[in-house]
Amino acid sequence: MNTLVNAPAMPKSVLYLDGVSVSFDGFRALNSLSLFVEPGEMRAIIGPNGAGKTTMMDVITGKTRPDQGEVVFDDRVDLTRLSEAEIAELGIGRKFQKPTVFESHTVADNVRLALSGERTTWSALFGSRDRITDGEIDIVLERVRLSAHRERLAGDLSHGQKQWLEIAMLLAQDPKLLLVDEPVAGMTDAETEDTARLLRDIAQTHSVVVVEHDMAFVRALDVKVTCLHEGSVISEGSIDAVSADERVVEVYLGR
């Protein structure tokens, strides 16, 4: 099966959605959605509940098939033809809002289990590797501020630390694109600040798409913002420009 497409006549992209529509029982979750993310870019996605943010992530990862439109990764791979596992193997990792970690195992073993190569939920979502060394684990845990908790049980971590551990489980696979869903939901203020710094650090070496409701956190990310409403993009630009957009104020931020 040929999954390659002709690259669009525009600058190179890591993720390109064009005219993507998805309907569920007559409800249009995505309505001709178009999005362009450059390599090495971190993009924040905001919007009210039901705007299509989760469906967009589901389409990118292969969980949901679009009714129409293009979904292209790395300028040439048609994601609509691939399974979730195949998309993960390409280098797209997703972190859901609720952290999914192995609570009865240590922090370090969580990273090992995520990359065990067994056909588990984790390996299907995030791909697999034959082995990961202790040194590689140390590097990843240091990056997510969990070095001091290497031998702690994951179940003993705070909510924020569990979120960071799941990010570590993604980073160990070295994905090209990370999709991060509401990473600071339920976090303390200090954890939220640390998470903003963490994602800015990750964005130095990876492309990142962050879905988030916390506007203070989005501002701290200091990146281009896309606002969705009823399955379409209604505003895009800096956080200041998007926050001042009357359409965004009306449907999302309130007056």
Question: Which positions does each model-derived feature cover?
Answer:
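Glycine-rich phosphate-binding loops of nucleotide-dependent enzymes
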Residues: 2-255
